Amino acid sequence: MKNVGFIGWRGMVGSVLMQRMVEERDFDAIRPVFFSTSQFGQAAPTFGDTSTGTLQDAFDLDALKALDIIVTCQGGDYTNEIYPKLRESGWQGYWIDAASTLRMKDDAIIILDPVNQDVITDGLNNGVKTFVGGNCTVSLMLMSLGGLFAHNLVDWVSVATYQAASGGGARHMRELLTQMGQLYGHVADELATPSSAILDIERKVTALTRSGELPVDNFGVPLAGSLIPWIDKQLDNGQSREEWKGQAETNKILNTASVIPVDGLCVRVGALRCHSQAFTIKLKKEVSIPTVEELLAAHNPWAKVVPNDRDITMRELTPAAVTGTLTTPVGRLRKLNMGPEFLSAFTVGDQLLWGAAEPLRRMLRQLA
């Protein structure tokens, strides 16, 4: 059995990872060691059937060097501090990371095994020891649209995202819900009075939204009842860093011989933990919609094709329907007026599952 260290297992992504590992009985195949950046020495958690003693110090290089595999959901600052020191010390173990820090390094592979198992296998055969989870929207796009990429049908992709609060973190989710609650509380009496005028209610809500009284420590501006058409840092070319990741990570995941252009706008909306994306896809040749649907549905067990039907779409292609599931549905598939090679698609996926924790879990399963 491999000795596997876990850092950041208490956080949001880490908690989802622990839950999935228990569900799949992954702990049966490893010797887990739990680390903490602040509470080492206290009792370690029990997942599965094995007691794991006490929490170890996440900054203790000697303790970390004793591990065969490290799985970290602790964030980029931790990776920046510990990873170089570990490698410089001669540690030859496997590093599995949820943070973006190492994604684009030449000696790292972005992991999404239903999409790039061939790349992962080649990396393992060539001694690669660093495996990093991808950007959530990129991973979810490839899970849903993987059939088109696998058959080399994609000329380019334009995307508009509808990204959930969870992409920012736990505090962002709390802030969104708090904003929602304050807006409701501000007009609760009027809403309970059928004779009240809805435009008066709207004016009160708008006034509170603009007043500066809503909590915005995390998002910077109100999200409830609104949206934020910018995610992550601003780059010199006018993109946000989130938008830059689309092309950079897609092509690295797929190990493409020539770059597939991917670009668009990334937008934060008031969903809790499911990212949605609207795509305009330029195909390399004309492909019928039934064939597109067959290719998408056959690519992996989680890519579910939703018929382009109003009622079915409203039931099945929403964050409310998909949250907490591993399904990555794709729908609104139709040809666009621009020409027979132009395809529309709409996808939804849980940002914390295939968007974050599940690729890490499955990579660990391969190594253990």
UniProtKB/Swiss-Prot annotation:
Top class in the EC scheme: oxidoreductase
Domain of life, per lineage: Bacteria
Cross-referenced PROSITE patterns: ASD (PS01103)
Its EC number(s): 1.2.1.11
Entry binding sites for phosphate: R103, K245
Lipid metabolism keyword on record: no
Record-linked SUPFAM superfamilies: Glyceraldehyde-3-phosphate dehydrogenase-like, C-terminal domain (SSF55347), NAD(P)-binding Rossmann-fold domains (SSF51735)
Keywords from the UniProt entry: Amino-acid biosynthesis, Diaminopimelate biosynthesis, Lysine biosynthesis, Methionine biosynthesis, NADP, Oxidoreductase, Threonine biosynthesis
Family membership: Belongs to the aspartate-semialdehyde dehydrogenase family.
Annotated protein name in UniProt: Aspartate-semialdehyde dehydrogenase
Gene it is expressed from: asd
